UniProtKB/Swiss-Prot annotation:
This is Phosphate import ATP-binding protein PstB. The complex is composed of two ATP-binding proteins (PstB), two transmembrane proteins (PstC and PstA) and a solute-binding protein (PstS). Its EC number is 7.3.2.1. It is an enzyme of class 7 (translocase). Belongs to the ABC transporter superfamily. Phosphate importer (TC 3.A.1.7) family. It comes from Synechococcus sp. (strain ATCC 27144 / PCC 6301 / SAUG 1402/1). SUPFAM superfamilies: P-loop containing nucleoside triphosphate hydrolases (SSF52540). GO terms for biological process: phosphate ion transmembrane transport. The lineage of its organism: Bacteria, Bacillati, Cyanobacteriota, Cyanophyceae, Synechococcales. The keyword Ribosomal protein does not apply. Part of the ABC transporter complex PstSACB involved in phosphate import. Responsible for energy coupling to the transport system. Signal peptide: none annotated. Residues 11-250 form the ABC transporter domain. PANTHER family: ABC TRANSPORTER I FAMILY MEMBER 17.
Amino acid sequence: MSPTAGENILLKAEALSVYYGNSLAVKDVYLEVLKNKIVAFIGPSGCGKSTILRCFNRMNDLINGCRVQGRITFHDQEINDGRVDAVELRSRIGMVFQKPNPFPKSIYENIAYGARINGYQGDMDELVEKSLRQAALWDEVKDKLKDSGLALSGGQQQRLCIARTVAVQPEVILMDEPCSALDPISTLAIEELMQTLKEQYTIIIVTHNMQQASRTSDYTAFFNARATEGGGKMGYLVEFDTTEKIFDSPDQEATADYVSGRFG
């Protein structure tokens, strides 16, 4: 079941399937993402969570042999329409990856570089400060903006990547296991940051951490996978609903088994 709220639907996937070559990786996904909400994608490894996440800003275009069937709409516009520029789409739907990946540049330039490429004409110092504040990093780095972003701790690097993402003023932030390489304190900082960010942005997060999904998200999509001929896996969406519903009274037995730790 997908939540619906009329004009608040920002992203929608309909009959979405993804192939790698001739192999069907994820089949027939339907879901809706509401504005200023956090949606968590959960499920065992190989069920297609990250594959579906990358569909929303066409990162899968960069994977040789990957093709998408079905529809994804953003503000009711089909994003795979030939008239949609993928680079512009990615500025509106940004991404934070599993491993922090700051540019080999100064902290300042990590923020300014993308904004400059995207044609930002305003006060760059102001944008850098605003972005770092939004990522709850400003107070820690304000006196060392000329230092390399690579010199920061892992948690700080991930927040720098979030600051870099928000600097280009996206509407949606995709997060692919953003805390998997971080310690518990840094993870908590990112989770607290997400609650602040959702006031301005819509967030979709892939996570293997059930507690993180239940703590941070408004809606949860549970994916699973079944074995295919040749030893592969095909992912599919089992259930999508409010996080409270998914964790407390899911409709599907497989969902209940997964969130309770009985498999996965």
